[in-house]
Amino acid sequence: MAYATGITFASRSILPICSRTFLSPLRVASLLVFPEKSSATFFRRVQVPHLFSTSTTTLFSSVKCSIHSTSSPETENQAVFRPNVVDILEERGLLESITSENLRSACSDPKVAPLRVYCGFDPTAESLHLGNLLGIIVLSWFQRCGHQAVGLIGGATGRVGDPSGKSLERPELDADTLEKNIAGITKIIIKILGSNPSPGGSYVIFNNYDWWKDMTMLDFLNKVGRFARVGTMMAKESVKKRLESEQGMSYTEFTYQLLQAYDFLHLFKNEGINVQIGGSDQWGNITAGTDLIRKILQAEEAAYGLTFPLLLKNDGTKFGKSEDGAIWLSPSMLSPYKFYQYFFSVPDVDVIRFLKTLTFLSLDEIKILEDQMSKPGYVPNTAQIKLAEEVTRFVHGEEGLKEAIKATEALRPGAETKLDWNLIERIAEDIPSCSLPIDRVSGLSIVDLSVSAGLFESKSAARRMLKQGGFYMNNERVDDENKRVDEEDIVEGRGLVLSAGKKNKVVVRIS
C-alpha cells in the first residue's frame, strides 16, 4: 500500500515522499493524522529526474519510496479520533449520495484505519476547470479529517471519453496531447493538495494507463466482461439519455463504465483504496465499481462510493462557465486576477451557498457573514470578496492571491494605486486590448479614442457614460467630453487604460 505525505515539483524533477511498507492500520493512522508526534519517523526522498522528458503515463509507477519507523506496541494500539467527514460534507451541501451508511460510521470509528479515497480526472484538457474543483475540495476534506487523498489520472480512460452528462462523443486526442494534458493536470493536483494544510498531509497520484496498457481484449472480457450484465449497463442514466438522443452512443462510450469499474477494483485490490468519490453524474459509474468488487472479490460492504452535487447557480444553470468559456484552474490558461474576478462577481443569492461548498471557512463564520448581509451597515460585496480570496488562495496559493488583489486594486476606477506598464501588460491578457499608432492617439479626443478602441459602440454612448460619472482613463474620472489625450496620459509612453464603469475596460497599446 503506497502512502504519500507530499509531492512537489522541482524544476524538471519530482520529489515524492511515500511508502510501500508493512505497518499496522493503527500505526498508519497515527502517522497520517498526527505526523508531528512521530518524531522517530523519517522519510527518504527519491528524485525522479526529467519529469517532462519521460512518459508521464508511467511516471508514478516508477517512483519507489520508503518510510522507516521505530514504533512501539503502545503507539500501535493508540486509538485516533477523526472528525466525521461525511457529516461535514452533508452540513456544507457537499453530499448527494453514499452507497452505504457504513461509510459514515467508518469515517469516525477510531478502530478503523484511515480511508483511502480517490477521485478520477480524465485528461481531456491541459488544465482542470471549476467543475473539477469540487472533487479536489472533497478530497481535501477527507485529507483534513485524517484520511488519504488519491488522485487518479485517466491516461487510459481519457482515450475513450466518459459519456456521463455529455450529448456528443468526445473528440479523440492524440498521444502527444494526452501526455501534455496528463502533465498539466498532475501539476495542478500536486500544487493544491500539497500546498494546503491537513492533519494527515497525505496524498498520492496514480495513472490508470499503468494497468490498462498491457491488458488485451481477451483479458478484459475474461476479467471484467463476464461479470457485467448488459441490462444493468443499459439501465444507467448516462446510457439511457444518449441512446434516446439522435447522436446515439458508440460501443467505446458504452464500455466506459466497465473501465471505470475495473479501475476501482484494481485500486481496491492492489492499493487498499476503498472509497471512490465523484459528481452526481458519476453515480452509475461508481456503483458499477462497487458491484464489480462485490462480485469478483466477494467483498460485501468493503468498498464505498460517495457523490457530491454538481455546482449550480440559483437559476439551475451550471456554475463554472464564463462568456469566454471554462474557468480554468491553471494560471497559464486563466490568470489568478481573472479567476478572482469570477468569484467576486457571484450574485448575493449564490454567495453564501458557495462559501459553504467552495471554502473551508467554519459554518459559524459563514453565518456571521450571512447575517451581516441583511443589516443596514453591510458593505456591498464583503461576502464576495471573502469567497474570491478563499478560493483563489486554495487554488493559486498566497502569491496568486496577492497578484489577483494587486491587479484588482490597480484596475478599480478611482483607485489611488499608480499604474505602471508592467502591471498593465499583465492584466492586458485578461481584458480587451488594441494597438494604435502614437499619431492616432496623441491629441485625439477621449470620446473618439474610446470608440476607436472598442469601449463604446458610439460617441453618444461614451458621452452618456461620461455625464453619469462612469468614464475613467488610467483610473481617473473624465469629466470633460472635450478632453484630448496628451503625452502625460500615456503610461511610460506605451499605453493607457480606459474604463466604462467598474467592469468594462480596454487597454490601448501605443504601437
From Swiss-Prot:
A motif ('KMSKS' region) lies at residues 318-322. ATP binds at residues 122, 321. PROSITE patterns: AA_TRNA_LIGASE_I, S4. InterPro entries: aa-tRNA-synth_I_CS (IPR001412), aa-tRNA-synth_Ic (IPR002305), Rossmann-like_a/b/a_fold (IPR014729), S4_RNA-bd (IPR002942), S4_RNA-bd_sf (IPR036986), SYY-like_C (IPR054608), Tyr-tRNA-ligase (IPR002307), Tyr-tRNA-ligase_bac-type (IPR024088). Its main location: plastid. One of its GO terms (cellular component) is chloroplast. It is found in: Plastid, Chloroplast; Mitochondrion. Coiled coil: none annotated. Its EC number is 6.1.1.1. Residues 444-510 form the S4 RNA-binding domain. L-tyrosine binds at residues 118, 162, 256, 260, 263, 282. It is an enzyme of class 6 (ligase). GO terms for molecular function: ATP binding; RNA binding; tyrosine-tRNA ligase activity. Disruption phenotype: Embryo defective. Developmental arrest of the embryo at the preglobular stage. It comes from the Eukaryota. PANTHER family: TYROSINE--TRNA LIGASE, MITOCHONDRIAL, TYROSYL-TRNA SYNTHETASE. Catalyzes the attachment of tyrosine to tRNA(Tyr) in a two-step reaction: tyrosine is first activated by ATP to form Tyr-AMP and then transferred to the acceptor end of tRNA(Tyr). This is Tyrosine--tRNA ligase, chloroplastic/mitochondrial. It comes from Arabidopsis thaliana. The lineage of its organism: Eukaryota, Viridiplantae, Streptophyta, Embryophyta, Tracheophyta. The gene is EMB2768.
